[in-house]
Structures are given as structure tokens and as C-alpha cells.
Swiss-Prot record:
Belongs to the tobamovirus movement protein family. GO terms for molecular function: DNA binding; RNA binding. Pfam families: MP. It comes from Tobacco rattle virus (isolate PpK20). The keyword Transport applies. This is Movement protein.
Length: 252
């Protein structure tokens, strides 16, 4: 049976926060380190005029203030993602826009995909919203300020005055923790995570759609079709590359 004082604390915290308390949840404090056992926060950022080969737009969902609070933990985990795509194109506009949430550390050499979450919307949709419950972890020894970026692909969409009139709003719910175990629904709904019951889609949606949080807007100008950056090892140079290099050397 759950301790009555804990029930009271959960109820009080839930009512006071109204899903808008984005600071640390100090329930069970690690006595040795004098810090919250878990740190739970939601952040939001907006990209305007997206669509182009500048695929890895920095999200800026973390700042130095956040880093100081999480660096003593072992892991940073994304547990929720919301993507909102806003289009200002006419209803008969063809094509699609594809949004990729990327891990900028992952490369071809790691034999892993960079895409954490992918979302596709019709170009003519006035507003498309998608919410995902995810489980993605990185070590806090990584450069967490620059890890997550957004990639955009516009397929068959006409360019208007050199730009695509799309805006993307990206929201992340993340948790700082020392746990090496995979977070599950029971853990997210435990007393260490007083931000709502994420098994309830309505509550999850209410939390993700908050407007009290400060948003950062980034102008991402169109610069050609989106092409994920790829590099070829020197061992895979084609005969044309070798010939071109040889001619350049002989001419000099």
C-alpha cells in the first residue's frame, strides 16, 4: 500500500504544477550528492522556412543552464516527442514534407541510422501534429547541447520566392537519470516522475501542447533539396577521382 504522505505529495505537486513546472522534481533526493534523483523537463523550439539541404538544423533544446543541472547524472533520455508542422500553402499544393529528428553524433561509420523519429505531412495541410512516446538515451559525457537536430525533406513541393513556407515546432520531454535500465511506463508513472500519466493520451497531449514554455525561433532558409551529408572513405575513391587527382598533380 502506498504511503499516504507520498500520495499527498503527488497530489499536491500535480495540482501545483498543472503540467507547467518545468524545473527539477525534487522528491527523492540523493543524500550523498544532495540532488534530485531524477530531473524531468520539456523544451520547445521552432524552425521557420524549412526545407533544404541544410538538413541538420540545431534544435537548441538545451542550454548551459540545463547542462549544469544534468551533467552530474549518467544519462539523458528522451521520453516524448511532439512535431507540429504548419504550412501556408494553398489547399491544392502537391507534395509532402518529411521531418527527421536526428542524432548528429551518428555517422555511416557507426553502422547506425541517424534518424530517431520520422514524420511525413502533406504540403497543403494547414497544421499537422504528431506525438511519439520514445526511449532514446545518451551519456551526459557527450556534447548534449549539440546532439539533436532536425532534418527536412520537401518532396515535389514548389518553391515560393526561394523558400518553403513551412514552420516546424519540435517539443521534447527528457529525463536526466543514473539508471541504466530501459524506462518503462510504470517508471514514468512512478513517484519519481510527477508530470502526468503518460499511458493516458489525453494527459500526454495536454502536457505536450503547453504554451507557457518559452520558445526559440530559428530562421532556416531554403538552400536546395535536402541531402543527408555523406562522405566516402579514401579506399572507395572511384577511378574518375584518381584520374582527376593525377591530372591535377601533373598540371602543377
Amino acid at each position: 500500500m502506498e504511503d499516504k504522505s507520498l500520495v499527498t505529495l503527488k497530489k499536491k505537486t500535480f495540482e501545483v504544477s498543472k503540467f507547467s513546472n518545468l524545473g527539477a522534481i525534487e522528491l527523492f533526493v540523493d543524500g550523498r550528492r544532495k540532488r534530485p534523483k531524477y530531473f524531468h523537463r520539456r523544451r520547445e523550439t521552432v524552425l521557420n522556412h524549412v526545407g533544404g539541404k541544410k538538413s541538420e538544423h540545431k534544435l537548441d533544446v538545451f542550454d548551459q543552464r540545463d547542462y549544469k543541472m544534468i551533467k552530474s547524472y549518467a544519462f539523458l533520455k528522451i521520453v516524448g516527442v511532439q512535431l507540429v508542422v504548419t504550412s501556408h500553402l494553398p489547399a491544392d499544393t502537391p507534395g509532402f514534407i518529411q521531418i527527421d529528428l536526428l542524432d548528429s553524433r551518428l555517422t555511416e561509420k557507426r553502422k547506425r541510422g541517424k534518424t530517431i523519429q520520422r514524420f511525413k505531412a502533406r504540403a497543403c495541410d494547414n497544421c499537422s501534429v504528431a506525438q511519439y512516446k520514445v526511449e532514446y538515451s545518451i551519456s551526459t559525457q557527450e556534447n548534449v547541447l549539440d546532439v539533436w537536430k532536425v532534418g527536412c525533406i520537401s518532396e515535389g513541393v514548389p518553391v515560393c520566392d526561394g523558400t518553403y513556407p513551412f514552420s516546424i515546432e519540435v517539443s521534447l520531454i527528457w529525463v536526466a537519470t543514473d539508471s541504466t535500465r530501459r524506462l518503462n511506463v510504470e517508471e514514468l508513472n512512478s513517484s519519481d516522475y510527477i508530470e502526468g500519466d503518460f499511458t493516458d493520451q489525453e494527459v500526454f497531449g495536454e502536457f505536450m501542447s503547453l504554451k507557457q514554455v518559452e520558445m526559440k525561433t530559428i530562421e532556416a532558409k531554403y538552400d536546395g533539396p535536402y541531402r543527408p551529408a555523406t562522405t566516402r572513405p579514401k579506399s572507395l575513391l572511384s577511378s574518375e577521382d584518381v584520374k582527376r587527382a593525377s591530372n591535377k598533380k601533373n598540371s602543377s
